[in-house]
Amino acid sequence: MKLTCVLIVSVLILTACQFTAAVDCHSTGYLCFWWHECCSNFCIPLQQRCF
């Protein structure tokens, strides 16, 4: 049960991380750094892309 909870929370955080990164990149283009490897890279200013 504990493992299931951890997995669910991890998926939610991962989804929120990706969604936030997409919003930040496409709406502002500012640098954005994330704790998870899926979002550990940054958005180049004004390029509106995550690398």
Curated annotation (Swiss-Prot):
It is found in: Secreted. It comes from the Eukaryota. Expressed by the venom duct. GO terms for cellular component: extracellular region. Disulfide bonds join 25-39, 32-43, 38-50. The keyword Transmembrane does not apply. The keyword Membrane does not apply. Residues 1-22 form the signal peptide. Keywords: Disulfide bond, Knottin, Neurotoxin, Secreted, Signal, Toxin. GO terms for molecular function: toxin activity. Its main location: secreted. Probable neurotoxin. The cysteine framework is VI/VII (C-C-CC-C-C). Belongs to the conotoxin O1 superfamily. This is Conotoxin Cal6.32. It comes from Californiconus californicus (California cone). The lineage of its organism: Eukaryota, Metazoa, Spiralia, Lophotrochozoa, Mollusca.
